[in-house]
Amino acid sequence: MTTTKTVREISETYFTAWQAGDFETLRELLAEDVDFVGALGTASGVEEALAGLKGLGRVLEKIEVHARVVEGDDVITWFDLHTSIAPPAATANWSHVENGRITRIRVTFDPRELLAAMGR
């Protein structure tokens, strides 16, 4: 029997997998043509998106979710991004889901302290 995950469950799984470094699960959640735009860059397609997630994943310590709002196929997650190199960053992530996969991601946060810690 096949079960279909809800948009909320897909979002929850995305953040849990990213925090755990489970990039195979992330690959299954992302559409092949996923489009990502964030404070640190952009990515077109699943390979570029995974590369970006892996890059930030090297310093990721914890994702502390404060709220998740779902409306139709859209979900906004408000969280603190804890890294090993900068103070926690309050972050908003909007994702759009189609046919059980994340097709678009937009992320916003103040990247100044993280960029400074990265020497950029």
Task: Write out the residue ranges for each language-model feature.
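A beta-strand edge to alpha-helix "cap/lid" segment located at domain peripheries
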Residues: T3, A51-R120
